Amino acid sequence: MKIAFFSSGTFGLPVLEELKKENHEIVLITKVDAPSGRGLKLQPSPPAVVAEALQIPIVKVNSLKNDFIEWYFSQGFDVAIVVDFGFYIPKQLFQADKPVMVNIHPSLLPKYRGPNPIRRAICSGELETGVTLIKISEKMDEGDIYLQERVLIDPDDDYVSLTPKLQHVSMELLKKFFLELKQGNLRAFPQLGDPSYAPKFTPDELWIDWQKPAHDIQNQVRALADVGAKTTLGSKLVKIFKVRISGMEDSLPPGHYVAEKESLYVGTGQGSLEILSLQQEGRKKQDAASFVKGLREKEGVFGG
């Protein structure tokens, strides 16, 4: 099958690799190289890096205008897959009968429409999420549903552990999609239920408010497990990557920590947390036991 694969982020990488393994003829359409890192050097998108390694043809774009549209329809694609792309898809593309265009969205639509569904589902304390394959529409993530599958969110799941589960389900749903398309059984149905939106995290949302309940802070840390939820210790930035609800009595004021043996506990607005993994500015990421060994003060305040 000849596939146009529209992607600029990381979520679609395992799907791209699996499609290549299954010997589909793929062309990657991705964003042009963008400045990144300390030196702001031009860097290719993550899919472009993978595609180059797999010898997949790459088309880099900064918009999808007339020249691109003409090229696109001249290629004889059977299917167009859109996942974590970052550009508006023109109506000429998504309304065409061929190639059939499908968008992979990692939520149970209509819940968590928008660019950040995985983090938002975790941060909201959801017990389940999923993957939905939809038609592209003029309004973001409002297209009819081809296929949908639920995925349980385990209590210990965070962004790092949940994302691969959703990527695996995405590929399994695509296989079903290809089969139904081949058999002429592909159908789509309207989204039902109350919609919600999943915007990107604002800079303020990356910081921990220790006045919030322990459960809410735990969910925030789980949602930011790859980048770390921010706080401070004195003048130093601290990123927290993993916590759990502590069995300690509510004796610690919000933000106040105490180090006991190899454990680190911190008070919140309701309950307390045990910090398991963190990184202080200028140091490597550490488990709590290693961090505690280097602490001069066994009691203090985060975010103070």
Swiss-Prot record:
<feature type="binding site">
    <location>
        <begin position="107"/>
        <end position="110"/>
    </location>
    <ligand>
        <name>(6S)-5,6,7,8-tetrahydrofolate</name>
    </ligand>
</feature>
<keyword id="KW-0808">Transferase</keyword>
<dbReference type="Pfam" id="PF00551">
    <property type="entry name" value="Formyl_trans_N"/>
</dbReference>
<keyword id="KW-0648">Protein biosynthesis</keyword>
<dbReference type="InterPro" id="IPR005794">
    <property type="entry name" value="Fmt"/>
</dbReference>
<comment type="similarity">
    <text>Belongs to the Fmt family.</text>
</comment>
<dbReference type="InterPro" id="IPR002376">
    <property type="entry name" value="Formyl_transf_N"/>
</dbReference>
<dbReference type="GO" id="GO:0004479">
    <property type="term" value="F:methionyl-tRNA formyltransferase activity"/>
</dbReference>
<dbReference type="InterPro" id="IPR044135">
    <property type="entry name" value="Met-tRNA-FMT_C"/>
</dbReference>
<dbReference type="Pfam" id="PF02911">
    <property type="entry name" value="Formyl_trans_C"/>
</dbReference>
<comment type="function">
    <text>Attaches a formyl group to the free amino group of methionyl-tRNA(fMet). The formyl group appears to play a dual role in the initiator identity of N-formylmethionyl-tRNA by promoting its recognition by IF2 and preventing the misappropriation of this tRNA by the elongation apparatus.</text>
</comment>
<dbReference type="InterPro" id="IPR041711">
    <property type="entry name" value="Met-tRNA-FMT_N"/>
</dbReference>
<dbReference type="InterPro" id="IPR005793">
    <property type="entry name" value="Formyl_trans_C"/>
</dbReference>
<dbReference type="InterPro" id="IPR036477">
    <property type="entry name" value="Formyl_transf_N_sf"/>
</dbReference>
<protein>
    <recommendedName>
        <fullName>Methionyl-tRNA formyltransferase</fullName>
        <ecNumber>2.1.2.9</ecNumber>
    </recommendedName>
</protein>
<dbReference type="InterPro" id="IPR011034">
    <property type="entry name" value="Formyl_transferase-like_C_sf"/>
</dbReference>
